[in-house]
Amino acid sequence: MTDFILNAQARTDLGKGASRRLRHAASIPAVVYGGDKEAQSLTIVAKEIAKLFENEAAYSHVIELNVDGAKQNVVVKAMQRHPAKGFIMHADFVRVVAGQKLTAKVPVHFIGEEAPVKKGGEISHVVSEIEVSCEAKDLPEFIEVDLANAEVGTIIHLSDLKAPKGVEFVALAHGDDKAVANVHAPRVAPEAEGAAE
């Protein structure tokens, strides 16, 4: 059983015009795919999906999707938002199959930021989420990045993070040791440089 539940209806009216009509009717188009079943087009009430995803944890948890009363466990794969207003315009969900690995983007939580700042550093967050591969039962709510021991000039990479048990960082598995955050010296404004001379 999951804490996150979303209701949907099967959708047969497809295409750009149909999607636009849905949005005008305060609903959004969505699709669920994966597992042994065919992809299925859905309609979801816009307020209901917006409320669910106000909780950051919903992005990285198994969601119980009720499609016309039939329940299935899914995770969000992708979400399209309006570029200016930020509301959800479309969602893709992937079915969760027990024993099979899935990929999902998990939010990053940075802790211990005060220590490098007290040493005169500025912190740049390079990523806000990390793509992971794991079974649904091992899907973490977030990945924690501890910056308490970071010195000025330090770059934190994926390889510096400890993945939770059963979880693999997708980029790292493909040889891409991405930067996650860096601690750098404060940039001096051009006016300040001129005043110093």
Curated annotation (Swiss-Prot):
Keywords: Ribonucleoprotein, Ribosomal protein, RNA-binding, rRNA-binding. One of its GO terms (molecular function) is structural constituent of ribosome. GO terms for cellular component: cytosolic large ribosomal subunit. GO terms for biological process: translation. Transmembrane segments: none annotated. It comes from the Bacteria. The keyword Ribonucleoprotein applies. Belongs to the bacterial ribosomal protein bL25 family. CTC subfamily. Part of the 50S ribosomal subunit; part of the 5S rRNA/L5/L18/L25 subcomplex. Contacts the 5S rRNA. Binds to the 5S rRNA independently of L5 and L18. This is one of the proteins that binds to the 5S RNA in the ribosome where it forms part of the central protuberance. This is Large ribosomal subunit protein bL25. It comes from Pseudomonas putida (strain GB-1). The gene is rplY.
